[in-house]
């Protein structure tokens, strides 16, 4: 047990350590975790012989439920509304068309029988939310015409549809006898009904129940995601559909702390993605992959250039979509973790040749991420679909700075240039707006242009928020008695090789905004700004 925990802990630390490095590479970071798993696997230097498909399917399905919940919860519905109809068409009928065409290719060209070919088509029919979100965010790809929102909604909502057809076809391929219309109806009705109901009920409870008091809302939401998946699944409904819809309903609700909850699930989802890709890399046997390389690449290329473009072109035609947008949406149909996890379901269900299906889907998913994921920014630029003025973060609910405004306070001391002047005069000297004047011995003043500022006033001012945070690094240091800051006036502090500015001092419970004459004492807490390297 201790060895297992030690291994898990070391792998998590290693993944988190290499993740920032991966963002500088020309391919999606998620590939690193697959490579790490393969290096530790049976054909790698570590020679870990891990072949428990059932355990992997359980762990990966659990991780996938949180990815799908977060995909719904973090979708900005207001931004997604204009593209919701085409996105839903792509995530439903698009899956059916893609699965059918791909299954036909597998049957006529690769020699699969019809059931196995359609099973393969269903497994790889959905676009992968984890991969799509990762590429969009890593490259901050804001796309014209709401294409980013379209891709996010489609990739977040099409996995449940692909899973549903995978479950049906895997049962048939394993020799099971099922009533297909009844099973599909049960999957959809229970999945959609319970997902919407759980999301609605959780939204009502989250502000009222004692379990959600004082910071426990995130844990409450964590439990809701589990229930939203487990209850429909237990009743033979579509748990993935339910958990996604519950996330959509909660994300659209006006609940306190939504941004903080989204940040928690963002971190949790990153861990889930790393877990899935690492386990899949650990589970695969690289020695078996060469025989699947040619059919896997052929299927990936066929989907990229034939089945996906046909599905996208047919379904977006009624909306008179720009051909460049159709081309980009077609290219952005990345296959990834969800497809490989669904292939595990076929293995566990006892489908003949299930291990070969897993290896084949693994090749398709990895090659899709490598080719489509790596080239997506370049393709978007070539098609002139990048919105240079946009910010893809606005399509997510964890985007906080919606009004672009921050509040600052200013103390008007003796000799301050604002003292004795009206706000009408001051307005021409600053881009900030005085929204409140706090004056000793008087009520707060809501000012107008005729308000005269007096010495001793505390002004609350609104200013545009600084957006380019990535270019500046802020750090807090304690001034030591023998450090280069102690005993120096700010203007006399030597800059050295890396210039910096002391933007704030904390001294004995007080906050000081310094100028060149400010004397720095040992024990001060200094907030220092430097240019990011």
Protein language model regions, located:
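Cytosolic regulatory regions of ion transport systems
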Residues: 310, 317-324, 328, 338, ...
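Transmembrane helical cores of multi-pass secondary ion antiporters/exchangers
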Residues: 1-389, 402
């Amino acid at each position: 047990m201790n060895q297992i925990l030690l291994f898990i802990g070391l792998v998590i630390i290693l993944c988190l350590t290499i993740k920032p490095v991966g963002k500088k590479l020309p391919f999606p970071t998620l590939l690193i975790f697959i490579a790490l798993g393969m290096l530790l696997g049976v054909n790698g230097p570590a020679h870990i012989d891990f072949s428990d498909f059932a355990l992997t399917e359980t762990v990966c399905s659990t991780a996938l439920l949180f990815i799908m919940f977060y995909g719904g919860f973090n979708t900005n519905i207001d931004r997604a509304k204009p593209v919701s109809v085409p996105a839903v068409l792509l995530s439903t009928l698009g899956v059916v068309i893609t699965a059918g065409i791909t299954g036909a290719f597998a049957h006529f060209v690769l020699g699969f029988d019809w059931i196995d070919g359609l099973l393969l088509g269903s497994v790889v029919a959905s676009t992968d939310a984890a991969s799509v979100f990762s590429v969009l965010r890593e490259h901050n790809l804001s796309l014209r015409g709401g294409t980013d929102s379209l891709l996010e909604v489609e990739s977040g909502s099409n996995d449940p549809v692909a899973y549903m057809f995978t479950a049906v076809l895997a049962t048939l391929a394993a020799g099971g006898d099922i009533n297909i219309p009844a099973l599909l109806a049960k999957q959809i009705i229970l999945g959609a009904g319970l997902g919407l109901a759980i999301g609605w009920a959780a939204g009502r409870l989250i502000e009222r129940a004692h379990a959600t008091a004082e910071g426990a809302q995130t844990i409450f939401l964590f439990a809701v995601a589990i229930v939203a998946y487990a209850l429909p699944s237990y009743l033979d409904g579509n748990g993935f559909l339910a958990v996604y819809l519950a996330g959509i309903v909660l994300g659209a609700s006006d609940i306190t702390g939504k941004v903080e909850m989204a940040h928690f699930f963002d971190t949790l989802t990153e861990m889930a993605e790393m877990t899935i890709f690492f386990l899949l890399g650990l589970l695969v046997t690289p020695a078996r992959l060469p025989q699947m390389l040619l059919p896997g690449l052929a299927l990936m290329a066929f989907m990229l250039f034939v089945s996906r473009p046909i599905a996208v072109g047919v379904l977006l035609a009624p909306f008179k979509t720009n051909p460049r947008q159709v081309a980009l949406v077609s290219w952005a149909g990345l296959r990834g973790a969800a497809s490989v996890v669904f292939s595990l379901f076929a293995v566990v269900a006892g489908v003949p040749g299930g291990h070969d299906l897993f290896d084949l889907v693994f090749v398709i998913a990895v090659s899709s991420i490598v080719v489509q994921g790596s080239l997506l920014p370049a393709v978007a630029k070539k098609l002139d679909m990048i919105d240079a003025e946009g910010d893809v973060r606005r399509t997510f609910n964890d985007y906080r700075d919606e009004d672009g405004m921050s509040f600052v306070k200013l103390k008007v001391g003796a000799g301050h240039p604002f003292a004795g002047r009206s706000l009408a005069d001051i307005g021409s000297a600053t881009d900030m707006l005085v929204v409140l004047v706090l004056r000793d011995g008087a009520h707060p003043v809501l000012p107008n242009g005729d308000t005269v500022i007096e010495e001793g006033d505390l002004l609350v001012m609104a200013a545009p928020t600084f957006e380019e945070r990535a270019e500046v690094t802020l750090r807090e240091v304690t001034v030591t008695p023998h450090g280069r800051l102690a005993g120096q006036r700010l203007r006399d502090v030597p800059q050295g090789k890396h210039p910096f500015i002391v933007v704030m001092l904390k001294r004995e419970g007080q906050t000081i905004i310094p100028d060149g004459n400010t004397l720095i004492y040992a024990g001060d807490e200094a907030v220092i700004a430097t240019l990011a390297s």
